[in-house]
Amino acid sequence: MLSPKRTRFRKHHRGRMKGISYRGNHICFGRYALQALEPAWITSRQIEAGRRAMTRNARRGGKIWVRIFPDKPITVRPTETRMGSGKGSPEYWVAVVKPGRILYEMSGVPENIARKAIAIAASKMPIRTQFIISG
């Protein structure tokens, strides 16, 4: 699963996801892509599940690019712990995704196979997405 090798700070603020994505919203590498339509935190496990689903469906041939990276640590407090005594310890990593962001790109396969593979990857995502074609 994806996670940063090292970070400047162990814990982040939660932040908020307002507006649309101005970066990473055009197809750069492949011919087909999966684009987010809603804001969300996408975990490294979800990213990996989508990538695996696409790879399995594309079989031989075809190249896949993952355009998001989980660089935000999410902390979780132990269960049945009283309030106070600081923030919890980092548990997993998420990518902050805003509407318009490209999640995956794909090329080297026919459109019908790409549609099928990307549809399966989309079902692994916690948000509504759309299939787009470059050009």
Curated annotation (Swiss-Prot):
Record carries keyword Ribosomal protein: yes
Organism: Morus indica
Compartments where located: Plastid, Chloroplast
GO biological process: mitochondrial translation
One MF term in the entry's GO annotations: structural constituent of ribosome
Main localization, broad class: plastid
Gene3D superfamilies in the cross-refs: Ribosomal protein L10e/L16
Keywords: Chloroplast, Plastid, Ribonucleoprotein, Ribosomal protein
Similarity comment text for this entry: Belongs to the universal ribosomal protein uL16 family.
Presence of the UniProt keyword Ribonucleoprotein in the record: yes
HAMAP family for this protein: Ribosomal_uL16
Any single Gene Ontology cellular-component annotation: chloroplast
Name this protein carries in UniProt: Large ribosomal subunit protein uL16c
